[in-house]
Amino acid sequence: MAKRDYYEVLGVSKNATKDEIKKAYRKLSKQYHPDINKAPDAAEKFKEIKEAYEVLSDDEKRARYDRFGHADPNEAFGGGFQGGGFDFGGFSGFGGFEDIFETFFGGGSRRRASGPRKGADLEYMMTLTFEEAAFGKETEIEVPHEETCDTCHGSGAKPGTSPQSCPHCHGSGQVTSEQATPFGRIVNRRTCPVCGGTGRHIPEKCPTCGGTGHVKKRKKIHVKIPAGVDDGQQLRVAGKGEPGVNGGPPGDLYIIFRVQPHEFFKRDGDDIYCEVPLSFAQAALGDEIEVPTLHGDVKLKIPAGTQTGTRFRLKGKGVPNVRGYGQGDQHVIVRVVTPTKLTEKQKQLLREFDRLGGETMHDGSHGRFFEKVKKAFKGET
């Protein structure tokens, strides 16, 4: 099946900025992550989203993709011996030009399938409260992974037996064939289909691991989450992925954070936003109110005549920057609440206020009137 357009996969335009691409990736990767989405095609969609992001987030890869699409010669031909933008390893129809160079130069540039390889990376989705993301925490997580089988010590063979050289490839991990072409006879080398390139054959497999040399287990990992992580961000824990193959280094663990929304606060970067309601009297006459922050309640002076939508900044009351570059602020946005149920006395006072001309009133008698309004709205006599 033909690959979908990467821009279409992420749901962005071809002129999308890096930030727009990153935001789309975070949203979709969270939506289709197999740990959260149990749909049958979730894993495949997640893989497709990740592949699209890896290309479009890299300026060089994106430029090639915009020019060639999925037919990019550097991508399609597998990244082997490259010259002038072409990879000779991709011409399988001609019997493999890569093998010509291996024949002439002894295969020095070829990595054997049985050589050391880095272990696979693991992903773990972690849910944090709003406060945990802001202040960080230390915790232990359990991650499913593969470990060396204790029964066979990684050999894959039944105790008392041992792996033997593959009879098909004679331990080389590759099979050789010759092919006649218009250019002459070409030698082809391919991964051995019997041993999968390991060069080994296990006559009697380990009953515990079934010959793989590894068993699935859950391991506990101590993780220190830095203060200031945001929804969709990742934390790389080096060396905590799957074990390496044939002596290679282990993979890495990537922790993807999912931050729960807060009932009062909203976050944008390192800044926090909240709305506070004010009564008509508080907005008109001014007041001192207490505003909740992540660091505790603080007093905020509301000047007389404050309007709905007025924003106040509480410096340094936001979220710490995850890279240690200071602290965000908290923005308090005022919403003046219009009363819906008024007593007769309150209605009379408001009518009197309207007759007196609203904001054109400045003398002392009008100040006393405002005090009456304030008391009436507070239920005082």
Curated annotation (Swiss-Prot):
Residue ranges annotated for the J domain, each copy included: 5-69
Keyword Disulfide bond: no
Subcellular location: Cytoplasm
Keyword Lipoprotein attached: no
Matches recorded under CDD domains: DnaJ (cd06257), DnaJ_C (cd10747), DnaJ_zf (cd10719)
Highest taxon in the source lineage: Bacteria
Comment on bound cofactor: Binds 2 Zn(2+) ions per monomer.
Zinc finger intervals, CR-type: 136-218
Molecular function as annotated in GO: ATP binding; heat shock protein binding; unfolded protein binding; zinc ion binding
Cystine pairs: none
GO cellular component terms, semicolon-separated: cytoplasm
Region described as Disordered: 154-174
Record SMART domains: DnaJ
Residue ranges of the TM segments: none
Name used for this protein in its record: Chaperone protein DnaJ
Upper classification of the organism: Bacteria, Bacillati, Bacillota, Bacilli, Bacillales
Name of the encoding gene: dnaJ
